[in-house]
């Protein structure tokens, strides 16, 4: 009995090209969805961490009479006396948040992290000394202060913003602007009433509080009112 063996035919070049085109098309369709899902996850983490920062901020304000302020550094160091020295200058939001750690109110560095273009890896939670606490790239939130680098207190307008992310960064920070691409045109903010919300970022990179009012708008009928100049204290980028 004669057995016939059929040779298995391989793919032709045309068939391989068709398969490649189909795979590329599917990848092109799914890539935007994957990016949106990633951005949404990063935004959700930012909201969660902002809430934790809010609890620490308001406990600090109750204890010291204002949110982190340069004048409070020595007070914290005297009252707590730990190895972690509270900064007496606030030139970055890292400095402001280090006061929360030095005061023993914040017990983790990771609440200050959120994924942005300038903060790319979570802190290691080693902050026993100042040089170890909240290093470059550990902090995703900017911190808002008033005229003359003076901290706000909870007695101000409840609609004022205390911390915010993601800030516009391309080698340096762009004043008063937010990164539209990071969280799909959303800015995550902690307000003075200890609420966390996501604001729309307009085409100019400005966060919109409501109606036509932007976050940094000043004067009558704004949350800042007359005579207050809100200033964003930026994080130390990676």
Per-range role (PLM):
Residues 2-48:
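Amphipathic alpha-helical segments typified by the pilin-like N-terminal helix
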Residues 28, 32-93:
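Conserved hydrophobic/amphipathic alpha-helical signal-anchor segments
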Residues 61, 68-69, 111-115, 161-163, ...:
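Structural recognition of the beta-strand scaffold that forms the well-ordered cores
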Residues 61-62, 67-70, 75-78, 119-126, ...:
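Short catalytic/ligand-binding loop motif for oxyanion handling, primarily in non-cytosolic enzymes
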Residues 74-91, 124-149, 207-237:
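Surface-exposed intrinsically disordered loops and tails
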Residues 102-171:
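Acidic, glycine-rich loop-and-strand cores that form catalytic or ligand-binding grooves
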Residues 169-238:
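C-terminal accessory segments of extracellular proteins
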């Amino acid at each position: 009995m004669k057995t016939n063996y059929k040779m298995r035919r391989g793919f032709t070049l045309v068939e391989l090209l068709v398969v490649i085109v189909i795979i590329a098309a599917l990848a092109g369709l799914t890539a935007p969805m994957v990016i949106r899902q990633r951005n949404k996850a990063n935004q959700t983490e930012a909201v969660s961490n902002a809430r934790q920062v809010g609890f620490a901020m308001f406990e600090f304000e109750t204890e010291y009479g204002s949110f982190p302020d340069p004048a409070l550094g020595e007070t914290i160091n005297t009252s707590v006396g730990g190895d972690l020295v509270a900064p007496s200058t606030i030139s970055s939001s890292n400095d402001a948040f280090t006061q929360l750690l030095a005061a023993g109110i914040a017990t983790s560095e990771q609440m200050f992290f959120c994924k942005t273009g300038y903060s790319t890896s979570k802190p290691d939670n080693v902050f026993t000394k100042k040089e170890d606490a909240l290093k470059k790239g550990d902090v995703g939130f900017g911190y808002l202060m008033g005229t003359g680098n003076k901290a706000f207190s909870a007695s101000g307008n409840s609609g004022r913003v205390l911390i915010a992310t993601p800030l516009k960064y391309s080698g340096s920070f762009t004043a008063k602007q937010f990164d539209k691409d990071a969280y799909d045109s959303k800015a995550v903010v902690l307000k003075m009433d200890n609420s966390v919300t996501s604001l729309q970022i307009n085409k100019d990179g400005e966060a919109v509080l409501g109606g036509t009012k932007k976050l940094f708008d000043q004067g009558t009928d704004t949350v800042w009112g007359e005579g207050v100049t809100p200033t964003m204290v930026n994080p130390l980028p990676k």
